[in-house]
Amino acid sequence: MKKRLFVLSLILLVALDQLSKFWIVSHIALGEVKPFIPGIVSLTYLQNNGAAFSILQDQQWFFVVITVLVIGYAIYYLATHPHLNIWKQLALLLIISGGIGNFIDRLRLAYVIDMIHLDFVDFAIFNVADSYLTVGVILLLICLWKEEDYGN
């Protein structure tokens, strides 16, 4: 992926995350639940002071430091490995975008705005940036697993 396309994609993904959070705060009261696709997905507005599943509540500096380290390393890795396959680039793009999206919330608000609730399973409420991070990490693990299988 060309550097310009990567940066534009990064900006677009972070903007989408931030716009979704702005919309939720503007249209749904804190703690309110609104069905989006009945029985499948609801939207709610939750202020998360921790990480996934609300672990490590009120440890904002920990998350800031970890986020800076992970994003910094991912950017360093991209810069020092210019010939990565498209799947690894996409994985790192998603990880960086998700990290930045939640980082903005932590710096601006001291919490992360979560809003997506899966009605059909007992699962934590999450946001768009969390989705990027999850898909990015899974994709990166698949890439690394495939490399190991093929001895690359």
Swiss-Prot record:
Signal peptide feature range: none
InterPro entries in alphabetical order: Peptidase_A8
GO cellular component: plasma membrane
Positions annotated as active site in the UniProt record: 114, 130
Biological source species: Streptococcus pyogenes serotype M1
Catalysed reactions listed for this entry: Release of signal peptides from bacterial membrane prolipoproteins. Hydrolyzes -Xaa-Yaa-Zaa-|-(S,diacylglyceryl)Cys-, in which Xaa is hydrophobic (preferably Leu), and Yaa (Ala or Ser) and Zaa (Gly or Ala) have small, neutral side chains
Entry-linked HAMAP family: LspA
Protein name: Lipoprotein signal peptidase
Protein origin, superkingdom: Bacteria
Role according to the record: This protein specifically catalyzes the removal of signal peptides from prolipoproteins.
Chain segments annotated as transmembrane: 5-25, 61-81, 84-104, 125-145
EC number: 3.4.23.36
Gene: lspA
